[in-house]
């Protein structure tokens, strides 16, 4: 009888498993080594082909490798490899579609060399380097006549001159005069080289068999230039810059400037009271559309991006979406964007100049939408499957077809094509991860909306194990996003899927302060962070507990950056969580004010400086309440994180907790910065996941480990 009951139990358990999970395994942390990413899709002018970046992992070398691939837009043939380099990025079609420019870094004497600009004939033949810059060259952009390429470089003209004789000694002593002198992502010490800001250069395309002519620097001076583009008639080059000295004393403000293709006087093309982050001239060259973030009066910690249009030159910018309460150019937070080769996306004009197409972030989705270029009215929105994230995109010259990288909660971004721009169902062109993912038991998350303490509606998702059975009790992990003005949603996150595969239910939500829910929702936490967002998170946990399948005695919490701050805050306010992992965190706001790579000189988070209002900085700092922490707490820190420096976060709390003899451990990742989880070295990303889940396994699953005695 006992055997019969056991057999019935086994059969029932098998029936409870989702059909798609039968015969499949759970995803693992080391599956990252076989992931393939697609980035920077570039539609050919005639809409027939798409060039894109394909990124893979070289596990042995512990590095990413990127090459250029091409796909037919009609899907008639499988995508094929175009280039054989391992650091090829930024493909850009010539106006006639006969050539492709791109950036490539080669190895010399075992070391990666500064990237140079290459040009490849699409009818066949080898790619040819057209630059030989002493420092990084990037961002190739073709002139309308196809005879010249503009690019960005940090070199000076004197760097190009041949050196003779002994090299004079250069001092390694730094004289620093500005408050912002380091930047996250600069390897090593993180110090910014202000003697060599990024400038715009041009180079004429050489005739066949001829050597390239020397490049020409078009912009100069102390201010970096970014996002360069040609005017429609090819006479000017536009770029974005903040040309104010020590601009950290003022609200964020960048404008679009213009300069002759031959260099000379720089003139302001478009200016707003705020920042401009992406733009596109109209087909007739008489207008320019851009994504602008108004500075706001009084200053705000969160300003919703809007779509603007201005007549050029000299026209007054008009905010088309001032009353549209979603994020223009919005995105979704995850850990599986391409670690290399990504490119920003912006507005695209319709061929007749009457409409604008751009990505919109709203309620966990990021999808293309169309707007009237005069009134700003939304003309069309999400297509047949809105539960996804459009990561990057481009269109053909006639603006009848768009190439896009699209991700879902169960699929890393693949290349798709959308005929008719928006509203149509995307057609999938690549399937690089399908073989692997076909072996994996994965499920999509359950979307929930719940009511917080003050009646505000909060959106969240529950990721369950592949073999989930409602009658069982599961440990819960609460995930908290950073920013804090970012958002979770319908995109692939390896971390969540692996936790679920390990038997955890994962809850992730967008508490107040998140982007993609409107201006008021985003900015409501400005001078109270952390605060009521904590209550939103706890309300989410309570909502999941009502479902009956969570073991309340086995709950953990983790988050990174702003999510690390909130993780620290959570464990100072409650003991309901039995383990916590705080990543790239903040524990002491005063230390952060002094050491982060950006300043808080303007009143976006605090009204005053810490030496002017020490009590307020202490009130909102988790370190102030360290004696309350009973939860075993792990810290995940990158040694080169200058965004949330360890000295302002985990180092402080770790030392304090050791003093108090509370269970804690600090895990340090050498040569890693704030982007460890998204673009850190492959093995470090895997080890990060192993440590996070290992800590939860110890305290929530009761699995002993020698790593954390």
What are these regions (language model features)?
Residues 495, 501, 508-709:
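Active-site-proximal cap/loop segments of hydrolase catalytic domains
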Residues 64-66, 154-211, 240-243, 250-255, ...:
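Predominantly five- to eight-bladed beta-propeller fold
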Residues 35-50, 85-103, 126-127, 132-152, ...:
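Conserved beta-propeller blade repeats
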Residues 56-60, 106-110, 156-159, 244-247, ...:
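Short glycine/acidic-enriched loop and turn motifs that connect beta-strands
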Residues 244-245, 326, 423-424, 430-553, ...:
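Cap/lid segment of the alpha/beta-hydrolase catalytic domain
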Residues 72-76, 121-125, 205-209, 260-264, ...:
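Short loop/turn segments that connect beta-strands within beta-propeller blades
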Residues 30-66:
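Beta-strand-rich domains and repeat architectures in extracellular enzymes and scaffolds
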Residues 6-16:
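Bacterial N-terminal signal peptides
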